[in-house]
């Protein structure tokens, strides 16, 4: 679903305890190393290791923040009304298995690189829980931290455009052949009908 299709009035998803921990860690890094940009892959691994080593008492403050945010989210969702027609979305066209794979967005590339790390910290989380966590982390990132993923998305878009052009170029001759074959069959059928009339 594109950005234009998203409902801006929908309440922001609740943050997990770990997301608050990562947020605090990023703020701490910014204070201690103001001129050092965050290398997200390394930073994510470091946060994961520190969270695992943190005692439950230390995690308590982050769980409290998460619970308060859950209360906020539940309250906002009670008064939220989705736009009309959202439940009756258009049916997607059947995909051609030979068509090029769609290009990935920056967020999808980010998710692919960080999904396993979240799963290792929270092995019992569902796919939906992990997706929410990824979304929360993505929103918390600065524009500078997103640059590597934006570049990856731009490169993949170039790949898709090129592959799509080649795919369409191959598809045109095939459509022409099908059309010609259909016309030929139609002519043969007319010819047979005509012969039949003459014999009568």
From Swiss-Prot:
> Source organism's superkingdom?
Eukaryota
Coiled-coil stretches, from where to where?
A: none
Please give the PROSITE patterns that the UniProt record associates with this protein: HMG_BOX_2 (PS50118)
Composition bias, Acidic residues: 190-200
Q: Which Pfam families match?
A: HMG_box, HMG_box_2
**Region annotation Disordered: residue ranges?**
64-103, 169-200
Q: What is its main location?
A: nucleus
> One cellular component GO annotation, for this chain's record?
chromosome
Q: Name one GO molecular function term.
A: DNA binding
Protein keywords: Chromosome, DNA-binding, Nucleus, Repeat
Start-end of Basic and acidic residues biased regions: 64-86
Cellular location(s): Nucleus; Chromosome
Protein role? Binds preferentially single-stranded DNA and unwinds double-stranded DNA.
Spell out the family assignment given in the record's similarity comment: Belongs to the HMGB family.
- Recorded protein name is High mobility group protein 1 homolog
Which species expresses this protein natively? Answer: Strongylocentrotus purpuratus (Purple sea urchin)
